[in-house]
Regions:
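Single conserved hydrophobic/aromatic residue that forms the stacking wall/gate
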Residues: 1-12
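C-terminal catalytic "cap/lid" subdomain
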Residues: 15-184
Length: 184
């Protein structure tokens, strides 16, 4: 069984290396400090994410730095065993960082210009929704909208930080702003 566990660990660790290497390259390009997510995003031995410990470690580490690049999608147990979030887990890491630094806004850059009024595979030229509430976002996710990883919402909502979903390929687009309430 040790061989199977080792093979599984290597597969998980290897799947995180793309994010790790991209983070290294981006940090070097920007001249920012690289912070390995394995050092600041904590999981328990059973693979359960530990939000409280992560926020403590991440907040302390980022308080020391003016600028940092932190890869998404993975973290580690206390003994250094790499653990990954599910697909789209980089959204979660971004949300955790926004919470840790008490950001005014969490911008989540993706390949679409926010949440759309209709499925673009069915309705051509679907328009994006400019502003929605967290409650409306939850309802959209129940209907299959999957622009943002569901676990990325809680840390920023808890901290009162709005989310802006933006399109990397069309940065001029407004995207969708996700807030607690849209009116008084």
């Amino acid at each position: 069984h040790k061989a199977i566990r080792r093979q599984r660990y290597m597969c998980i660790r290897d799947s995180s290396r793309g994010e790790f290497l991209n983070g290294k390259v981006m940090a070097a390009y920007l001249g920012y400090e690289f912070v390995d997510a394995a050092e600041v995003v904590r999981f328990e031995k059973d693979g359960t994410f530990n939000a409280e410990v992560t926020n403590e470690i991440l907040s302390a580490r980022l308080a020391e730095l003016e600028h940092a690049v932190i890869p998404g999608f993975y973290g580690a147990t206390e003994d250094g065993t790499v653990v990954t979030f599910s697909r789209g887990g980089s959204d979660v890491t971004g949300s955790l960082v926004a919470q840790a630094v008490q950001a005014d806004l969490y911008e989540n850059w993706t390949d679409v210009s926010g949440f759309l009024i209709a499925d673009p595979r069915i309705v051509k030229n679907s328009k994006s929704i400019e502003t929605i509430t967290y409650k409306e976002l939850r309802e959209l996710s129940y209907m299959g909208a999957s622009v943002l990883h569901e676990d990325a919402i809680f840390p920023v909502r808890k901290a009162g930080i709005p989310i802006n979903i933006k399109n990397t390929n069309a940065p001029q687009d407004k995207g969708t702003l996700i807030v607690e309430a849209t009116c008084c």
